[in-house]
Amino acid sequence: GTRMKIIFVRHGEPDYRELEERFYTGFGMDLAPLSEKGRQQAQELCQNPLLGSADILVSSAVTRALETAFYVSCATGLPLRVEPLLHEWQVLESGVENFEKARTLFLENNGKLLPHCPIQYETAEEMRARFIESMAKYSDYQKVVVVTHRMLIRQFVPNETIDFCQVIECEIEI
């Protein structure tokens, strides 16, 4: 494998109101744009000098990530690639309560899915594999900015909490 320098960026704050009012669920919620505050976070993010040191910008296809990446691309001039497999952690039952319940189970069980678990979700191992598979095609690049989601980023960095538009540098074996 190759070691790849990755600059993780979590997307800005999204605004789900319009979709919630229309009872969208699952991937439908991923259509949510950034909120006013989220756009501000994305603009402030662009002042981070680390971003300009990368060779390419890769984003999750999910709107909140892609909109964040658009600001970074405009500010840095980095070429932007969209990767559909960099989406957020998958919980098979939809709804915010299930997501939070699943998250608690995921953390309690160290990212494993125990047999007879009431909620089915993606394991830590599956998430890591999906990320690495998705990033393999960028192995020729020295340093890559990746705009993606909290649970996915957490599989590679020790940070307990990751704020909107937080930047975290790390090295990963691809």
Question: Where is each model-derived feature located?
Answer:
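Active-site-proximal alpha-helix that buttresses catalytic centers in soluble enzyme cores
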Residues: 5-81, 166-168
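A short, acidic, amphipathic alpha-helical segment used as a generic capping/interface helix at domain edges
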Residues: 127-139
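Generic beta-sheet signal
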Residues: 6, 55, 140-150
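Short, well-ordered beta-to-alpha junction loops that form the rim of enzyme active sites
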Residues: 59-63, 85, 147-151
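Acidic, low-complexity terminal tails and accessory targeting/binding regions
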Residues: 3-5, 48, 81, 85-103, ...
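Short amphipathic alpha-helical/adjacent loop interface patches that line ligand
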Residues: 42, 131-132, 150
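Phosphate-handling substructures
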Residues: 18-19, 28-33, 74-130
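Short, active-site-adjacent cap segments at secondary-structure transitions
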Residues: 15, 65-66, 89, 152-154
